[in-house]
C-alpha cells in the first residue's frame, strides 16, 4: 500500500507539537493539510491566497451567543450536512444548530501587534524545526499557522456561556470545528463528534480522510453502528468514547419491497481522489448500454466536492447517461421512484442505498476503502452483467434479509 503522503503528513505533524494559549497546534492544523496528500506542488498563488484570506477568519464567538444547553455545528453549507445536524436536534431538543460557513468574518490588522507577533511565531516554528518541505510549502504553512494563532487568540478571549453543557460538531478533526472542540474542552463542556463516513482500512493508498480517525479529538463519537465501535476498538480507542446512535437521518427508514427490475440506476461517483476510477466506470456503463440497447437509464451523481467540469464528457442522451443536479441530495433521489438500484464508487452512500431498500452494486476496480457489505462487487462488464442477473433471480426475501443484516450492523442498529 502507498503510504508516502501519510508518512509525509505524520512527519510534518511531529514538528508542529506546539501549544499556544492552551491549544495544541498539532490538533488544529490537520484539516488544512490537504497539500500533504498530493504530488501537486504548492504554488506562489497558493501562498498569496493563504496570507490574503488568512487576514480574516470566521467569527466563532457567534456560536456562543445562545441560551440553549447544547450547541450543534456543521462547517460547510451543504444541504445533506445541514440535514444531518438538524436530525441530531431530535435527540437534543434544547439546542441551536449553526452552519459555520455562514457566520461573519473578523480579523486582525496585518499591521497590528497581534498579527505581526503571530506571523513571527509561525516563521520561527516552521523554519527552525527541520520541516522537510519546499520553501514555497513552508511559506504556505506559515500562512496557515498565522491564521490559526489569530483564531485562537480571538476565540480564547470570549467567555463561554455557563448554560452550554454539550458541544456536538459535524467533524472534530477538521478546521474550525477542531478549534471549537478544544475551546469547549478547555471550558469543561462535553464534546461530541458526529460520524459522517465509514471508518475502515485502506487497500491502495492512505487518503486525506485518515485525519477523521487520527485527529478525533472530541470526547465522544456518535456512531452509526456497532461496526464503527468494533473497528475503532482495534485501533486502540476506548469503548467509553462511543455513543451507539445510528445514522439519525435514516432512523425512520424501513426496508420493505425490494425492486429487482434494474431499469433505472443512480450512479454514486467517488470523490476527487477516485476520478480515474469514476471515468473507467462511466466508460463501462456506456459500453453496457450500447451492448444491451440502452436497457438501463443511468443517473449520474457527482460527489459534492468534485468540480462540474469533471466527467462531463460522459453525459450522453444517446447512451442514456444523465447527470443529476447538485440541488438534489442523494437521500432525496433514493426516497423517490426515480431509481430502482444504485452503483457506488468508494462511497458510504452505498449504505444509504441499502438503508432505503435499493440494491447497490459496488464498482471495485481500484477499490481503496474496505467496506463491510453484501456480495455485490464487480470489476468489469461481465461482472456487472453477472451481478444484475444474480440479484434479479435471487429471492426478494433473501435480499431483504441480507440488507437488514448489513444496515443493522453498520448504519441503523434500531432497524426492525
Regions found by a protein language model. Name each.
Residues 1-416:
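Catalytic-core helical/loop segments in enzymes performing group transfer/polymerization on anionic/lipid-linked
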Amino acid at each position: 500500500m502507498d503510504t508516502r503522503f501519510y508518512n509525509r503528513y505524520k512527519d510534518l505533524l511531529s514538528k508542529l507539537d506546539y501549544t499556544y494559549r492552551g491549544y495544541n497546534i498539532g490538533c488544529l492544523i490537520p484539516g488544512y493539510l490537504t497539500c500533504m496528500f498530493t504530488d501537486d506542488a504548492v504554488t506562489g498563488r497558493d501562498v498569496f491566497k493563504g496570507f490574503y484570506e488568512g487576514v480574516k477568519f470566521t467569527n466563532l464567538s457567534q456560536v456562543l451567543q445562545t441560551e440553549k444547553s447544547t450547541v450543534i455545528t456543521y462547517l460547510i453549507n451543504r444541504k445533506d450536512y445541514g440535514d444531518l445536524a438538524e436530525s441530531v436536534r431530535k435527540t437534543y431538543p434544547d439546542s441551536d444548530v449553526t452552519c459555520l460557513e455562514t457566520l461573519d468574518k473578523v480579523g486582525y490588522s496585518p499591521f497590528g501587534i497581534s498579527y505581526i507577533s503571530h506571523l513571527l511565531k509561525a516563521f520561527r516554528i516552521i523554519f527552525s524545526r527541520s520541516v522537510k518541505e519546499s520553501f514555497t510549502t513552508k511559506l504556505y504553512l506559515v500562512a496557515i499557522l498565522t491564521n490559526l494563532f489569530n483564531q485562537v487568540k480571538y476565540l480564547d478571549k470570549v467567555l463561554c456561556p455557563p448554560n452550554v453543557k454539550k458541544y456536538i460538531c459535524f467533524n472534530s478533526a477538521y478546521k474550525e470545528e477542531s478549534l471549537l472542540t478544544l475551546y469547549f474542552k478547555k471550558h469543561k463542556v462535553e464534546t461530541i463528534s458526529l460520524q459522517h463516513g465509514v471508518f475502515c482500512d485502506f487497500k491502495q493508498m492512505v487518503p486525506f480522510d485518515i485525519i477523521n480517525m487520527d485527529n478525533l479529538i472530541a470526547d465522544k463519537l456518535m456512531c452509526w453502528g456497532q461496526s464503527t465501535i468494533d473497528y475503532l476498538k482495534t485501533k486502540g480507542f476506548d469503548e467509553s468514547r462511543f455513543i451507539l446512535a445510528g445514522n439519525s437521518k435514516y432512523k425512520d427508514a424501513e426496508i420493505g419491497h425490494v425492486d429487482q427490475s434494474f431499469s433505472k440506476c443512480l450512479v454514486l461517483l467517488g470523490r476527487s481522489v477516485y476520478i480515474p476510477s469514476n471515468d473507467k466506470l462511466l466508460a463501462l456503463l456506456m459500453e453496457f448500454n450500447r451492448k444491451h440497447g440502452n436497457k438501463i437509464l443511468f443517473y449520474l451523481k457527482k460527489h459534492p466536492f468534485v468540480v462540474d467540469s469533471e466527467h462531463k464528457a460522459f453525459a450522453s442522451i444517446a447512451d442514456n447517461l444523465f447527470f443529476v443536479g447538485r440541488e438534489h441530495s442523494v437521500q432525496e433521489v433514493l426516497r423517490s421512484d426515480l431509481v430502482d438500484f444504485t452503483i457506488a464508487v468508494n462511497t458510504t452512500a452505498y449504505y444509504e442505498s441499502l438503508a432505503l431498500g435499493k440494491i447497490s452494486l459496488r464498482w471495485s476496480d481500484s477499490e481503496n476503502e474496505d467496506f463491510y457489505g453484501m456480495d455485490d462487487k464487480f470489476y468489469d462488464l461481465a461482472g456487472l452483467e453477472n451481478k444484475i442477473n444474480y440479484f434479479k433471480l435471487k429471492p426478494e426475501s433473501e435480499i431483504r434479509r441480507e440488507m437488514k443484516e448489513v444496515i443493522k450492523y453498520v448504519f441503523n442498529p434500531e432497524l426492525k
